[in-house]
Curated annotation (Swiss-Prot):
Keyword Nucleotidyltransferase attached: no
Modified residues annotated as Leucine amide in this record: L8
GO biological process: neuropeptide signaling pathway
Species whose genome carries this gene: Rhodnius prolixus (Triatomid bug)
UniProtKB keywords: Amidation, Neuropeptide, Secreted
Protein name, per record: Pyrokinin
Post-translational modification: Position 8 could be leucine amide or isoleucine amide.
Principal location class: secreted
Function of the protein: Mediates visceral muscle contractile activity (myotropic activity).
Family per record: Belongs to the pyrokinin family.
Keyword field contains Protein biosynthesis: no
GO cellular component terms given for this protein: extracellular region
Amino acid sequence: SPPFAPRL
């Protein structure tokens, strides 16, 4: 996932 997207 992109670095600016939160990891859930």
